[in-house]
């Protein structure tokens, strides 16, 4: 099984890309307002898209597709959290609170 620490690493990379905005960065582009859409709309639309793809993969019994689309969905949720300034630790804390 993979190391769950990778979520923290990916989150930090996302935060860094939002802050430093390197040219050619997908995250930097996604989290920047443009002439047609505010960044929050672009991020939320990606979450909707990835959710739908995950649901279809699950419905089709596509195990690899579920893993792939889950990764895409989680990635975009991490982008949303970072964009909104929500630390991933806050989500972990909520999981711990609910576990009790």
From Swiss-Prot:
PANTHER family for this protein: HISTIDINE BIOSYNTHESIS BIFUNCTIONAL PROTEIN, HISTIDINE BIOSYNTHESIS BIFUNCTIONAL PROTEIN HIS7
Subcellular compartments: Cytoplasm
Keyword Hydrolase: yes
Keyword rRNA-binding: no
EC number(s) on file: 3.6.1.31
Pathway: Amino-acid biosynthesis; L-histidine biosynthesis; L-histidine from 5-phospho-alpha-D-ribose 1-diphosphate: step 2/9
Protein name in UniProt: Phosphoribosyl-ATP pyrophosphatase
GO cellular component: cytoplasm
